[in-house]
Amino acid sequence: MCGRYSLFAPPEAVEQRFDATFDEPFQPRYNAAPRQSLPVVGDDRDGEIRTMEWGLVPPWADSREDGGFINARAETVADKPSFRDAFRQDGPGGRCLVLADGFYEWVESEGGKQPYRVTLADDRPFAMAVLWTPFEPA
């Protein structure tokens, strides 16, 4: 998954696209980053868009600073202890969709790295699959 993304589409467009409503006031994000509370649609299909902190904290962590993983490889997600339970849905946690209307990819240039925002051709909001676990200090 990318390390930065955006969601600043009109809230009505987001709600219509995902057939869900925000459970708290929508805050546009131009540069969403790990550890921020960001909008998601859960796998419970309750019709609510809620916020969750971006970054998976593994079950053995003593604090939020001990984790915050934002990338998992498809080849190993079912086996790595950090992601296994959420992926298999064995216990607390599971899957959800993080809502976005763009994400940033960085390209090396002479002056350093340059971010480029990637969107759908029609600029509609889209979703990215994520795994989540509740944080409970070990």
PLM feature spans:
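Short linear sequence motif anchored by a di-proline
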Residues: 1-138
